[in-house]
A protein has these predicted regions:
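Terminal, low-structured helical/coil segments at or just beyond the last alpha-helical repeat
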Residues: 283-318
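Acidic, polar-rich low-complexity tracts and alpha-helical solenoid repeat scaffolds
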Residues: 150-153, 266, 274, 313
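A conserved position within tetratricopeptide repeats
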Residues: 147-154, 187, 191, 224-225, ...
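Alpha-helical adaptor scaffolds
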Residues: 160-271
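Long, positively charged, glycine-interspersed low-complexity recognition regions
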Residues: 239, 263, 274, 286, ...
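Short alpha-helical linear motifs
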Residues: 77-84, 276-278, 309-313
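Extended alpha-helical scaffolding segments
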Residues: 267-274, 278, 282-283
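Extended, well-structured beta-strand/loop surface patches
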Residues: 1-54, 60-161
């Protein structure tokens, strides 16, 4: 029985070698088998902090017995293996430190540490691995461009996609003027617009991001009166107003929630308690905390100590 070949140094050669075929007299490992191993990027990226233009590249790896390994991105992505490798066609070389890895029987590529704007590509085989970090500059702008184009096709016939696009812009503080148009489309576009709590709240969020708070408040006054406005949605809006320091308006919202949802015996009382606390009416705040705690639902029992602490502070005059 023949001995099994070692992966690194035998199946995968070290350094650059003359493979005895093709035009290359000093070829790196093809980072795979048979045809050219390739990697494609739809947009410009950074590899280990270095710029690489969008496109498809031949991917090679200079494997060394000691020290760093080097990833090579070649402009030639069509030649067979590395038999015709030409360093003059290199688009980028990046040195990386190889690492010890959990045993992997088969050559494996994958992506780890995935985030919105970056990820790490890795190769693992046997007990070794090598990786490179990919960063996408201006990822939010790229995403908005994709969404803008998608809204011109079938996704554009669903109001929720317009709403989601506007929300993305608000969350990332980009493209706000167009986001306002998208939010309005979700509300009032012929055949697809839906005027409901969520679409109005989205428009208000865009207006707030544009520092048009007075207009946003008018939109939210309308939103909380929508049939789709739930107890929790209105309550959360009140909490948002509290966080913004608008205690008077927050109390008005909590009072409206209480008035329009008499069947609710907990959340609306919590809202009133917080609202009255914010405006300095301790008597009403204590009364509403006591009622809320008395009606505590099972799914809130984990927060009982927090509610009791709020009540205790009020009773102690703190």
């Amino acid at each position: 029985m023949l001995p099994m070949a070692q992966t690194w140094g035998e199946l995968v050669h070290y350094g650059f070698i003359d493979q005895g075929f093709g035009s290359s007299k000093a070829a790196p490992w093809r980072a795979g088998a048979n045809e050219n191993t390739t990697i494609s990027f739809s947009h410009d990226v950074k590899i280990e902090g270095k710029d690489l233009k969008a496109g498809t590249y031949g991917l090679f790896l200079d494997v060394e017995k000691e020290g760093n390994w080097t990833w090579i991105f070649s402009k030639n992505s069509t030649s067979w293996g590395s038999y015709f490798y030409n360093p003059g066609e290199d688009a980028l070389r990046v040195p990386v430190k190889p690492y010890d890895a959990t045993y992997t029987e088969f050559l494996t590529y994958g992506f780890s540490e995935r985030n919105a704007s970056n990820a790490t590509a890795y190769l693992q085989w046997e007990s070794k691995g090598a990786s490179f970090k990919i960063d996408v500059p201006n990822v939010n702008e790229l995403y908005v461009n994709i969404v803008r184009n998608e809204l011109r096709s079938s996704p554009g016939f669903d109001y929720q996609n317009w709403m989601n696009a506007a929300q993305f812009c608000v969350q990332n503080k980009i493209n706000l003027e167009e986001a306002l148009t998208w939010a309005e489309t979700a509300i009032s576009a012929p055949f697809l617009g839906q005027e409901n709590f969520n679409t109005l709240q989205t428009k208000a969020a865009v207006l707030n991001a544009l520092n048009r708070q007075a207009e946003a408040a008018v939109v939210m006054d309308k939103a909380i009166k929508m049939p789709s406005a739930t107890v929790q949605a209105i309550h959360q809006y009140g909490r948002t107003l509290l966080a913004a320091g608008d205690s008077k308006k927050a109390l008005e919202v909590f009072q409206y929630n209480f008035k329009t949802h008499p069947e609710e015996k907990f959340t609306t009382y919590v809202g009133l308690a917080r609202g009255y606390t914010a405006v300095g009416n301790k008597k009403e705040a204590i009364k509403n905390w006591e009622t809320a705690i008395k009606n505590l639902p099972d799914n809130q029992k984990a927060n009982l100590a927090l509610y009791e602490a709020e009540l205790k502070k009020l009773k102690e005059g703190k």
